[in-house]
Amino acid sequence: MTESDVAESIGDIVSRLNNALDDLETKKNQTPSVLKGPTVSQERPSAPYRQKIEKLSAEVVDSNPYSRLMALQRMGIVRDYEQIRDKTVAVVGVGGVGSVVAEMLTRCGIGKLILFDYDKVEIANMNRLFYQPNQAGLSKVEAARDTLIHVNPDVQIEVHNFNITTMDNFDVFVGRIRNGSLKSGKIDLVLSCVDNFEARMAVNMACNEENQIWMESGVSENAVSGHIQYIEPGKTACFACVPPLVVASNIDERTLKREGVCAASLPTTMAVVAGFLVMNTLKYLLNFGEVSHYVGYNALADFFPRESIKPNPSCDDRHCQIRQKEYEEKISSEPITLDIQAPEDEPIIHEENDWGIEVVDSDTTEAPSSSAATEVAPGLKFAYEPTQTPKKNSSDNLKLSPSQAVTKEWMENIRDALLEEDRLKKEQNKRK
């Protein structure tokens, strides 16, 4: 092959490569934009729509996003709603439940949110709430932050895009629990919204180690039931005190998954569980109502069981056992105060009315009514007074009319005559 033939072959190859590249570029441009995975830089939003609000106001105007929240204070539900701006909450798992929880807390005006997740937004997530199709390809924590700063720019949002179950990341997670608050101290609450037991055990271990109160949540694989649980180390059962079968059997969850098979998911169930979790969070942070220790949800029967689970003295988590001993010592050292008051016999007060109706005790003897007509209301009187019928205790107390007395005497005479006739017949029979 001559040199000219080689050059011609190379030129032909280059030409075909250029044509192939042109075809690929054409097909790329024809692909719907929703299927493209946008880069993080493409999805960065513009600046927040308003300036930060320094102090909450109850003024009812269209431009005040806090007026309806502050109404809780005016109605006596919450004593000081503004203290929510001093609270820091960590949300572990920003998926179907966690993303809605983060949004609700942001709308409620929480001071700071710390988000933990390592997953990315996918088109398959669109059957759930919060995320948008144009956020596909972004990390969930970044997409959540980009959305939440527009919902409420007053909330400080910190994100961590990693898996907390690895050793190094677990240490960072514990560090943020210890020093992640607005004042660089311990945070107020941890919310677990993860979808696997390994991550739940990691959160449980960290919170037991730091003596951190947290709340756990979950939705069943068939998407028609869920639960939330309040966990206070030492006082209530931790996640390891009553472990599910998968954890108790030391089964690796990853071995249970099958290719092409996924769990069911309904935005309705996730929204209900997220609502319960945030409501319990608000009651705990703002100190109103009753914080539920466990609330279940069965969508098929609209059943909401509530339970209170005590800690397991034989829990496998050593930090849980330590917290149990600390709690028992705390309870035993507190003085027992008995607030016993003698019952007072208070008279029953009945509401006055315009009809002269009075409620009296059943043992009270009614006074005889006067001959004068009773005034029922101003200008209204009875046409006549009802007669009182005497009580009939026995036949001796009966007062008979003259005709009744004659009839009674006549009946007694007949009875005596019949008795006498019967006596005479018996005597005659004896003689015979």
Curated annotation (Swiss-Prot):
Region annotated Disordered, chain positions: 25-47, 363-406
Residues that coordinate or bind ATP: 96, 117, 140, 163, 196
Any one GO molecular function term: ubiquitin conjugating enzyme binding
UniProtKB keywords: ATP-binding, Metal-binding, Nucleotide-binding, Ubl conjugation pathway, Zinc
Catalytic residue list: 262
Pfam family, one: ThiF
Record-listed Zn(2+) binding positions: 238, 241, 315, 320
Biased composition (Polar residues): 29-44, 386-406
GO cellular component, one term: cytoplasm
GO terms of biological process kind: protein ufmylation; response to endoplasmic reticulum stress
Quaternary assembly: Interacts with ufc-1.
Function summary: E1-like enzyme which activates ufm-1. Required for interaction between ufm-1 and ufc-1.
Similarity comment: Belongs to the ubiquitin-activating E1 family. UBA5 subfamily.
Protein name as catalogued: Ubiquitin-like modifier-activating enzyme 5
Protein source organism: Caenorhabditis briggsae
Gene: uba-5
